[in-house]
Amino acid sequence: MRVLALDSTGPYCTAALCDTSKVLAYKTEKIDRGHAERLAPMVAEILAASRLTPKDIDKLAVCTGPGSFTGTRVALAFAKGFALPRKLPVIGLSSHAILTAHFDPEARKKIVTISDVRRGELSWSAIFNGSILQTPLTQPKDVARKRIEALGPDNIIEDGIVDGRILAWLAADLDPAEYPANPLYSRGPDAKLPGGLDP
């Protein structure tokens, strides 16, 4: 199964194309801003490098966050726009799920994943023995650190970088009904409509 995996939730713009356990092409660039302008050309580049066309893709996978409102939407919108006319399934996984995927769920480890989402805030989540203790939560740094310390984690993953290849491998066997591509924003949009309403 050929899976195209995308991530635009953080400072990196990433696209990976894998076939079962084989990496066909992979690109990741630290760009901070401009994901919307870079992602489509990046996908075209990895398709060309693999000598494949869009019709050769079987499934899409996208990192759903936590990330900024704008950045998170870039890969999500691209994935859904790519998949819809081709009737392809789209799998959504959080960056925290991707970063903890290599831990053995039978090891009974308490693992905390932390992302610095700027503005003095951290987004963090926790798992224990493969089960969710805390879904991604954004809090002021001092509050988050106290909560994490009280939890007493065995391992902490901080500001990890999503590997698109791992995202593709994980997504290959997942059901889109159980892992929908829904955004996980670290905070709401900065832009406001007249009257202070969110867009």
Task: Locate the predicted segments by residue.
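Oxyanion-binding and handling regions
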Residues: 1-23, 30, 34-37, 91-199
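A short glycine/serine-rich beta->alpha loop
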Residues: 26-31, 64-68
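Short, well-ordered amphipathic alpha-helical segments that serve as non-catalytic structural scaffolds
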Residues: 35-50, 96
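Phosphate/pyrophosphate-binding loops at sites that engage ATP/ADP/AMP, CoA/4′-phosphopantetheine
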Residues: 43-59, 151
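Short glycine/serine- and small hydrophobic-enriched flexible loop segments
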Residues: 44-45, 80, 84, 170
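DPxDG-like acidic metal-binding loop motif
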Residues: 59-90, 95
